[in-house]
From Swiss-Prot:
Hexamer, composed of two different subunits. This is Canavanine hydrolase. Its EC number is 3.-.-.-. The keyword ATP-binding does not apply.
């Protein structure tokens, strides 16, 4: 499932949006999947 992410990211580049392929079950286990934004450790 592709989820559009719109959020400021702690990186030099701050893309307005990016698409990340994630697993819903995995998302529930992600402690950093929370308000404001979502940082997928990526660049």
């Amino acid at each position: 499932k592709f989820v559009p992410i719109s959020c400021p990211m702690p990186t030099n580049r701050q893309p307005k949006s990016l698409v990340v392929n994630i697993n819903e079950n995995s998302v529930k286990k992600m402690p950093w999947f929370t308000n404001x934004x979502t940082y997928f450790g990526x660049t």
